[in-house]
Structures are given as structure tokens and as C-alpha cells.
């Protein structure tokens, strides 16, 4: 007698991939980002920055990656970074860009001023407001923690003065 067990492979993969996902800032194609990566040279490691425009985001789950393009000494250079890579230390958003495409491969043919991307001021303002709100929440939680410490100290049982010296 054979029993067949049904396994939903998509659910199984999502469960495994959740362990490998990292929290990176929310960026889109058109944004200018600075990616700090670990570079190993011989027996020492150092950090190297790559700053450019995100021209594509590909894949999903643990296979998700993004492509960054910059112009270095007059030549276009593109690098693909996996989101889940342990070699990516940090991704910093330098500037928010306003584009109407998900893939910006057309930037490869453009040069100079034609390759510029408009700044998305509304997203910049939202980011600033979110950062200010996060700062306020952090200071409020610190104040609440300090208040909780004060109440714990004042709630300690007092020892009677006549039994203190014995």
C-alpha cells in the first residue's frame, strides 16, 4: 500500500527562503544607490563602494538581484548584486529617481545630459518624514525605558534602619 504525500513546492521554497532574506532599503529602478561590498585581497578583506543608478531588479525570493550602472572614466560599468549575498555589506540610497519603466536598459545608449534621471521629490519628502517619525519613536521608546527603570528602582523594598547594622 503506497501513500502519496502532497507537498506544495512553492510553499516549501518560500519557507526556506525566508531564512535567507535580508532587510535592505526600499529602492526602485531609477534610484541612485551606493553599494558597499566586501572584497577579499589575499589574506585581508576591505570594503569597496559602487555607486550608480539601479537599472533593473530581477527575480524573486532568495534569487532576487539588482543591476547598478555607472560611468567610470567614460566607460559604462554594470554590476549585478544578489539581494541575499553576504558580500553586500550595505546599500545606501543617494538619490531617488523618477522613471516610468521597470527596466532602464535604454540608458546604455544614452550619453551625457540625455542619460540624466529626474529626481522624485515626493519620495524624498516621504523618506524624510519617515526618518523623522522613526527618530521620534526611538526617543519616545528610550524615554519610556528610562521611566520604567526609575519606577523599578523606586519600587525596591526598603530595609528598616534598626536591622541594617546588625
Swiss-Prot record:
SUPFAM superfamilies (alphabetical): Translation proteins SH3-like domain
Q: According to its record, what are the GO cellular component terms?
A: cytosolic large ribosomal subunit
Region forming the signal peptide: none
The subunit field of the Swiss-Prot or TrEMBL record says:
Part of the 50S ribosomal subunit. Forms a cluster with proteins L3 and L14.
Q: Which NCBIfam families match?
A: rplS_bact (TIGR01024)
Family note: Belongs to the bacterial ribosomal protein bL19 family.
Instruction: Report what the protein is called.
Output: Large ribosomal subunit protein bL19
Annotated gene: rplS
Amino acid at each position: 500500500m503506497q501513500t502519496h504525500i502532497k507537498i506544495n513546492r512553492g510553499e516549501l521554497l518560500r519557507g526556506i527562503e525566508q531564512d535567507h532574506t535580508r532587510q535592505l532599503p526600499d529602492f526602485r529602478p531609477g534610484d541612485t544607490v551606493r553599494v558597499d561590498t566586501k572584497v577579499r585581497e589575499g589574506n585581508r578583506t576591505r570594503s569597496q563602494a559602487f555607486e550608480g543608478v539601479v537599472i533593473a531588479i530581477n527575480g524573486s525570493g532568495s534569487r532576487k538581484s539588482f543591476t547598478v550602472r555607472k560611468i567610470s572614466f567614460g566607460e559604462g560599468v554594470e554590476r549585478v548584486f544578489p539581494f541575499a549575498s553576504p558580500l553586500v555589506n550595505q546599500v545606501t540610497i543617494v538619490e531617488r529617481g523618477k522613471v516610468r519603466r521597470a527596466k532602464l536598459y535604454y540608458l546604455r545608449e544614452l550619453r551625457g545630459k540625455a542619460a540624466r534621471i529626474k529626481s522624485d521629490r515626493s519620495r524624498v519628502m516621504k523618506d524624510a518624514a519617515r526618518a523623522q517619525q522613526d527618530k521620534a519613536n526611538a526617543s519616545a521608546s528610550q524615554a519610556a525605558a528610562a521611566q520604567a527603570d526609575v519606577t523599578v528602582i523606586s519600587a525596591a523594598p526598603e530595609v528598616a534602619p534598626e536591622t541594617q547594622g546588625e
